């Protein structure tokens, strides 16, 4: 298979949109919210194996060099860092401080000005899902550097794999570095999937039964060895991501899920504060909370599109 031309890479912002990518992103962000609500099911090992790898894989699908490192940093600053810093300052710094001083509400992660730099340490902060935007920025810059100097696809993949193992598993680094680089290999797989047009070329009827069977079977094994466990988890995640993408390719579009997938960054940056608000309202049923959150975005997304486009990567 020959690699696709750079101009054929899908976009998350404009006219070259591929509908089932929005569907996949919608499934992904809804799984994230489901997880943060603390909902537990017998399928948790499978869902947990797919949730974050899928998000990073999709990010790799959309990777572009933009003609140089400065252009890449400028683009990713607009799409990742500006939303990160805006919502970090408002929901992880100002909100906890004001809630503490005005309402007497305390946050487990703190409520003073030390929250300004909490994301650079090992500590948690109130709107913890924001780490993903910061982490994606690091992964994009790191991947640009690697693919700029490593021309072999195999060596590039091995480099991402080794960096992911060392930085993400063997070391414990602050500023969400370990957390982000633990998924670096899936970023590479997403990039390669678009480079060689893998998802488009695969036939759903032929490949889906195989990937689904592999996904289910991989979840039955629980090795105790660290190396075998890493291989098993990687195989489980890759099979799960492929299965979900092929399902989305077959379905193409589900109105609500595809809609929130297109604006998934808005759900990412706001769902944790909304969950805390529901906690204050003492809604004890996570399924009810999930439905309330899902319904609220029918109003939140249009509001943010109109009044907050620059801080939600819409401009």
Where are these regions (language model features)?
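Alpha-helical transmembrane segments and their immediate juxtamembrane cytosolic regions
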Residues: 1-315
